[in-house]
């Protein structure tokens, strides 16, 4: 039986989602619980492998089990054993051929920035602080130019190891907030550090150091050295996982390009 689990977590005190040889991870927390229940190792398969310090409002994973436990009982058992910075929102039974990575057709991230004269210690780990004044209109103009299907070689970590660095973005926009801004980006998938590199570039645009007109040129150049900065992990939230094409169509219309996963991605 295949079980699908929908979770949220505050990522400040995790080394990321994926299991690490030394250190606290989200995967480690769940596999420890499942091992105790099954008396053997049970591997979980996530929709996304978030990095150290990255939060998740909506994240999924699946696992296989022979235990005859109702979904609500799974939820109760896990939440009873989990630390305060992880929560199971929902558990369901899915078809045996369902896969959290391969059936994921899209993801939405939100990057939160607050501004002001002074850093707020109570925002530490939850939002990124920038004291500089930023031109949000120009930032949004630049952000819009990332929408569509592009090769994002110049906007990801040089450690990215995938055959194709082409991704489709359905949404890329700057939203003004009460004390700063959010960057919201929805796409077919994301390369390693891609969202954080996009944010760092947009902030450079906001400072007047780069121009929106440079986006097509930089995409064509495919040279990370021309976009050298990466925004901090704090402030980055995995906000939504799209597990069905219809969900994407509902949000972005019937004419969008939908990608089916054939191999594992960096995120």
From Swiss-Prot:
InterPro entries linked: PsdUridine_synth_cat_dom_sf (IPR020103), PsdUridine_synth_TruA (IPR001406), PsdUridine_synth_TruA_a/b_dom (IPR020097), PsdUridine_synth_TruA_C (IPR020095), TruA/RsuA/RluB/E/F_N (IPR020094)
Q: Name the Gene Ontology biological process terms.
A: tRNA pseudouridine synthesis
Active-site feature positions: 51 (nucleophile)
What reaction(s) does this enzyme catalyze? uridine(38/39/40) in tRNA = pseudouridine(38/39/40) in tRNA
Q: Which residues bind substrate?
A: 109
Q: Which Gene3D superfamilies match?
A: Pseudouridine synthase I, catalytic domain, C-terminal subdomain (3.30.70.660), Pseudouridine synthase I, catalytic domain, N-terminal subdomain (3.30.70.580)
Tell me which Pfam families the record gives.
PseudoU_synth_1 (PF01416)
Keyword annotations from UniProtKB, A to Z: Isomerase, tRNA processing
Top-level EC class = isomerase
Care to name a GO molecular-function term for this sequence? tRNA pseudouridine(38-40) synthase activity
Q: Report the EC number(s), separated by commas if there are several.
A: 5.4.99.12
In the record, the note on similarity to other proteins reads: Belongs to the tRNA pseudouridine synthase TruA family.
Q: Which PANTHER family match?
A: PSEUDOURIDYLATE SYNTHASE (PTHR11142), TRNA PSEUDOURIDINE SYNTHASE-LIKE 1 (PTHR11142:SF0)
Function summary: Formation of pseudouridine at positions 38, 39 and 40 in the anticodon stem and loop of transfer RNAs.
Describe the protein's quaternary organization and the partners it interacts with: Homodimer.
What is the name listed in the Swiss-Prot or TrEMBL entry for this protein?
tRNA pseudouridine synthase A
- Which species does this protein come from? Staphylococcus carnosus (strain TM300)
